[in-house]
Every structure is written in C-alpha cells, then in structure tokens.
Amino acid sequence: ITPYLYKEHLVFAVDGSDINIPTTPENLERFGTASRKGTKPQAQIGLGCLYDVLNRFIIESDINRVKFDEMKIAEQQVDRLPETIGVTRPFFVIMDRGYPSIPSFLRMMDKGIKFVVRLKTSDFKSEQQALASDDEDVLIKLTKSRRYHYMGTENEALVMSREGFLIRLITVRLENGNSEVLATN
C-alpha cells in the first residue's frame, strides 16, 4: 500500500491529552490526578500520540502519569519510528504550542528531523517582535538567560554546545485578523 504523502513526505503530528479513568486507589497511585486540592480526586492518564495526518491513523501512543513531559514523549516516539513502521521516506512532525523546547529543537535538528511548531507569543519573544517580514530565517542566540533554565539538567551540555541556532519563523495571518507564528527547520 502506498501511503499518502505531502511533497514526498509523511506528515506526522504529536499531541497529548488527559483522559479520565475510573477513580480507584490503584489508578490514583499509578497515574495521579489533575484535580485541585480540596476537591474530589479524579484519576486521569496522560496520553501522548504520534499521528499520521494524511493516512489518518495513530502510529505511536504512550500512556503516562497525568502530568507528563509531552515533548519528551514526542521525541521518544519519533525516535522509535524506524522500528515502528520502518520509515524509509522523509517525514516531518507538526507540534502545537506547549511543545517548543530549545533542547528538543536542537536534538531534532542534529538528527535531521524536520518539524513545524506553532509558537506562543512568549516563545522567542524578542525574535518574533523583530520580524521584518512574514517569512524569515532567524538566529536564536542561546543567551545566558536562555541557558540558565537548563543548567544542572540533562540538557545543560546540549545548550552549552553552541552559541545559537538558525530557525525559520513564518507568520500566518488568520481570517479573524489574528496571527500565528510557526517555527520550522
């Protein structure tokens, strides 16, 4: 079976969701709750999925504790693609706000993984504000303040390994008059 492609690429999207499950002591201990303190706990799982957008099926899914690192799970799922489906075609990964992470961007770029990520206005804020056009390659400098967050973590060596990285920022004008900024490599 020949899969549907976009410009010779498979198109994957990653996303996470919280799902209510039966509230039992075992589920609360194993998966946790997102309920506020002082309210009745509701057991939930955190579900991370990697979805083939054009062929319309889930490639990978992981069940996690309710509050989980969606980007870390997404990276693991992308890393498993060769064993999961035997990827022989180029692909790119679409991610929503909440996924942008400097270490994740660097790891994906180092591995040659193409991505498109919707940014929040606070992501690379100064670079977004300095955009002179709707489509620019921008140098993201790894300043002391950007690196500070990763000091003493597993990502310290990675963010210290370079002065910055080049990323393409694309502004998309929406029908309602708002704009979204996408980051891609």
Segment roles from a protein language model:
Residues 1:
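Short, basic alpha-helical nucleic acid-contact segments in DNA-binding proteins
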Residues 5-10, 14-27, 35, 39-185:
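Single, function-defining residue in the core of a domain
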